Amino acid sequence: MKIYRVAKASEYLVITGIFIKDIKLKKKAWIFPGQSCTVLDLSPVNYTFEVQAMSAEKLPFVLPAVFTIGPRVDDQESLLKYAKLISPHDRHSNHVNELVQGIIEGETRVLAASMTMEEVFRGTKQFKQEVFDKVQLELNQFGLLIYNANVKQLVDVPGHEYFSYLGQKTQMEAKNQARVDVSEAKMKGEIGSKLREGQTLQNAAKIDAETKVIAMQRAGEGEKEGIKVRTEVKVFENQREAEVAQANSELAKKKAAWTKAAQVAEVEAKKAVALREAELQGEVERMNALTTTEKLKADLLSKASVQYETKVQEANWELYKKQKETEAILYEKKAEAEAQKASADATFYASKQAAEAELYAKKKEAEGIVTLGQAQGAYVSTLLNALGNDYTAVRDYLMINGDMFQEIAKINAEAIRGLEPKISIWTNGGDNSGGITDGAMGMKEVAGVYKMLPPLFKTVHEQTGMLPPAWMGALSEKSS
């Protein structure tokens, strides 16, 4: 039965099982049969350690530290690593605690061994940052992130009071420095008091002198300002008088222009009246001439129009006739072209159908040959399996089943039909039953071979008509 699970704000659901290739992280999901669901808490955890390390001078010390470590929630790959490697264990278990402690102690000891005690003590911030960086690099393999790291004050190891002695040294140096500072402060106070008195008298005299100078400067500046004001007033009066004169001059110019414009307008009005009278008189005369012209044009154009219309009608008829003839020829050519096209299409279609039919027949014939070959192959394979893979037996069976021996006999019979062979049998006529020695027996065999030659030559001559060479002998006339 499937179950619907929902994780809290600081949790994830780790789902494994069927339909899931590796693992799946979800905030909410259906859990089907065959799947396993584990809740993954993302809250960071505080780990408190007291790391015992040794500096480059072989001085041991204790470094108390508190690390706040948790899974990296902003990286999906880191969450998958954490879910695979850390989630099976409780976050507060010894396994996780020892893992984190081992990484922190190892990196802290390695780093402390490369620094002197003075460098560790005075560069606590830098030392803390380097430890932070190196530990974070190792925790990345497990998908963990250091959210905060607090390194407390370095502590002495019992029996090695380095920091205690260093503190006493610092206290004595501070005490001596304080005494020196008090003496220097008293000396500076007395010197400063005398210096302030002298500076007060000097400043008073300086201020008196500067006051007199400033008073004289102020008096001169007042006189200069008075002269400047009077000059500016005179300049302003002159400017106003010039502006008044300029305004009077412009007014006189405008009056003259206005008078001239009035006179010109009066003359233009008179001329305009005369021009208008002349225009009207010309218009009357033009209208009279136009009337006369239109009358003559009407008389002359009436005849020309009739002739023009007649010619136009004749030309249009000729044009229409030629267009129709051209259209008829074009239609005939078009019909002929369409007929040729239809004939070509029919021929092409017939050729195409014949080619397709031939292709189909060839294809079916090839398929039949392939099918027959496959059947014969299966038949031969079955025979071979039935006869125990004996190729000789299969060959003999196929030759018998295919009447091969009958065909061979028939062919041989046809080949010797009509022949009359003569069969001769001969022997040397001797044996070794008479007690002949081995040497005599060998000569007897040679003699037997010579006795066999005449009957052999005779048989060859009878069957083939060929005679032996002269050096081997000749047949008797009786035999020939």
UniProtKB/Swiss-Prot annotation:
A lipid is attached at C37 (S-palmitoyl cysteine). Transmembrane segments: none annotated. Keywords: Cell membrane, Coiled coil, Lipoprotein, Membrane, Nodulation, Palmitate. InterPro entries: Band_7, Band_7/SPFH_dom_sf, Flotillin_fam. May be palmitoylated. It is a lipid-anchor. One of its GO terms (biological process) is nodulation. SUPFAM superfamilies: Band 7/SPFH domain. The keyword Coiled coil applies. Expressed in flowers in green pods. Primarily expressed in vascular tissues. Upon induction of nodulation, expansion of expression in the root cortex in the region of elongating root hairs, which will eventually become colonized by bacteria. Expressed in the infection zone in nodules. Belongs to the band 7/mec-2 family. Flotillin subfamily. May act as a scaffolding protein within caveolar membranes, functionally participating in formation of caveolae or caveolae-like vesicles. Required for early symbiotic events and nodules formation. This is Flotillin-like protein 2.
